[in-house]
A protein has these predicted regions:
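Conserved catalytic alpha/beta core of Sir2/sirtuin-type deacylases, generalized to analogous enzyme cores
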Residues: 1-286
Length: 286
């Protein structure tokens, strides 16, 4: 049995399906935080400052005053507000229909929800770009980021800086608002639903599918999925990701730890291609 058929068999015969989606899945769908050519085109000022990808902005310390908010406005508008559900996520949803599944994603692009996945079946483990909260935490209120972005865009300068007067501020106390990411009620609820799913499926057969997960947020999906596989007698684990020889990691992206190798399969291929092949197989057998 080849890898695709083995994966399809596990997907269709297991009592439960746990899906992990990393940056590689959204990259296969068309959203890449590592695209240096696009970054240079869209953010020449940051490129000149030595920042060459969206990934590098996460740890960048050399922001000019007001520049990070200007960058975030344009970046979030492009990734969250202007990008619809991408076809690959529609395909993944169609593939999982009929399964008792739960999906965990480290991506903040909201693609699962845009594609119509039931919110109760999705945990956005890193949160999303969609809300702002008070930096002083004067309350637990959450604010939709879209109106603030729309109000800021006309005031972004060529170097991406934005004057303080055009930054978002808390309507209660006046402190700056900041992206919420994980500090939301939705995140807390998703975390609880994830743990409930793991408890419910503890003694059952489960297919664990990991798409496009590397090492940037290994503690969110990669390491927990390996642990869950090792703990469960009836687990079957599939790691689907392309390798990156230029990576500084000592472990290859598709590598499987030896202790769980007997119930795991590494598929060193593009996540999108694998999902499309699985969906074609499902349709052929319908």
């Amino acid at each position: 049995m080849d890898a695709i058929h083995e994966l399809y068999h596990a997907l269709t015969t297991s009592d439960y399906v746990l899906v992990g989606a990393g940056a590689g899945l959204s990259a296969a769908a068309g959203i890449s935080f590592a695209d240096e050519r696009a970054f240079k085109r869209d953010y020449p000022a940051l490129w000149a400052q030595g920042v060459h990808s969206d990934y590098q902005t996460f740890s960048y310390k050399g922001w000019l005053p007001g520049q990070r908010w200007g960058y975030l406005c344009r970046h979030i508008k492009a990734v969250l507000l202007d990008t619809p559900a991408l076809p690959l996520y529609d395909d993944l949803k169609a593939l999982l229909e009929g399964s008792d599944y739960f999906a965990v994603t480290s991506n903040v692009d909201h693609q699962f929800i845009k594609a119509g996945f039931p919110p109760e079946r999705v945990f956005e483990a890193q949160g999303s770009y969609g809300e702002l909260v008070c930096s002083a935490r004067c309350s637990d209120d959450e604010y939709d980021i879209a109106p603030f972005i729309d109000a800021t865009l006309p005031h972004i300068k060529d170097d991406l800086t934005v004057d303080a007067a055009h930054h978002p501020h808390c309507p209660r106390c006046g402190a700056p608002l900041r992206p919420a990411f994980r500090d939301t009620r939705a995140h807390a609820l998703g975390d609880q639903r994830y743990h409930d799913f793991l408890a419910e499926s503890a003694d059952a057969s489960i297919a664990i599918l990991e798409f496009g997960v590397g090492f940037n947020s290994a503690g969110v999906i990669r390491v927990p999925f390996e642990r869950i596989t090792g703990e469960r007698e009836k687990a079957r684990f599939f790691r689907i990701t392309v390798d990156y020889p230029e990576s500084e990691e000592e472990i290859a992206y598709p590598e499987i730890p030896v202790p769980i190798a007997d119930k795991s399969l590494s598929i060193n291929r593009d996540a999108g291609a694998v999902i499309r092949e699985l969906l074609a197989l499902k349709k052929a057998r319908a």
